[in-house]
Amino acid sequence: MIFANGRLLPDSQLSQVLEELEEAVNETRACRTLEPETVISALQAVGERLDRGELDPLILRYAGPGGRREVAHIRPLLRREALEYKLAVELGIPLYSFQERPFGRTQTVPLGTLFHVTAGNVDGLPAFSAVEGLLTGNINLVKLPSGDQGLSLAVFQLLTEQEPRLAPFLYAFQIPSRDTAALRRLADLA
């Protein structure tokens, strides 16, 4: 499966998505910004649904019996307070702001486009990796591990349904590692 612009697409559309991706990424970089508050609010809303147990069937379906425990382990990292603290510690100053320095001034801005190749040993790790990129206003291209059973795609779908402004900043692909041509095309965009 492919996740592009907030939609799940079949693998048969990979060539078409890759063909259109550079233009879509460039348009997003040129015309849109993503504020951390937008991401944090979406994560907070999805997290509240998770806390109420509304997403338990989804977790069981895509992550198996141990999935709820794994999600509970990372849930504290996705709370508003933890995300705001992470941004303050790692960025130092708010995204898009300036800080005067003795030698000039510094502005914190997104890198642009990130290409994530994540390990498959923890369910949902690709989603967590992309969340970090979203928090800093980056476009995220995620190569899903072969063992991903759909949890990351489901998380991406939930986030973009909650907050449609995230959709142009989030893409995911179930591309086999042996498809080096497709992976190279994604890497070239980052």
PLM regions with names:
Residues L95-A190:
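Rossmann-like NAD(P) dinucleotide-binding subdomain of oxidoreductase/dehydrogenase enzymes
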Residues M1-T108:
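N-terminal Rossmann-like NAD(P)+-binding subdomain of aldehyde/semialdehyde dehydrogenases
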